[in-house]
Amino acid sequence: MAFGKKPDFKKKPAQNPLFKRKRYCRFTVAGVEQIDYKDVDTLKDFIGENAKITPARLTGTKAKYQRQLDTAIKRARYLALLPFSDQHKK
């Protein structure tokens, strides 16, 4: 019977081999008011391997701080504190 009732298969929750932690905003926890472009060590944590800014949905950063982070990274790149791309490493 091609149009008969399908058997009930219970779906198992997808088991992710990597443990995902709950994301939280590091700047809210630390009580940061303004993100400084001169704090290069903090900014490097929010830049991926290919020198792209990591989105807030992956880092857990709130929208207010993500905008400040975006501006701070762009200023640091303009002042040559951070690289624009990873091409120069080759």
Swiss-Prot record:
Biological role: Binds as a heterodimer with protein bS6 to the central domain of the 16S rRNA, where it helps stabilize the platform of the 30S subunit.
Q: Which residues cross the membrane?
A: none
According to the UniProt entry, its GO molecular function terms are: small ribosomal subunit rRNA binding; structural constituent of ribosome
Mention any Pfam family matching this sequence. Ribosomal_S18
Do you know which InterPro entries this protein is assigned to? Ribosomal_bS18, Ribosomal_bS18_CS, Ribosomal_bS18_sf
Q: What GO cellular component entries does it have?
A: cytosolic small ribosomal subunit
Gene encoding this polypeptide?
rpsR
Q: Name the UniProt key words of this record, in alphabetical order.
A: Ribonucleoprotein, Ribosomal protein, RNA-binding, rRNA-binding
Q: What is this protein called?
A: Small ribosomal subunit protein bS18
- GO biological process assignments: translation
Q: Which family does it belong to?
A: Belongs to the bacterial ribosomal protein bS18 family.
Looking at the keywords, is Signal present? no
Assembly, per entry: Part of the 30S ribosomal subunit. Forms a tight heterodimer with protein bS6.
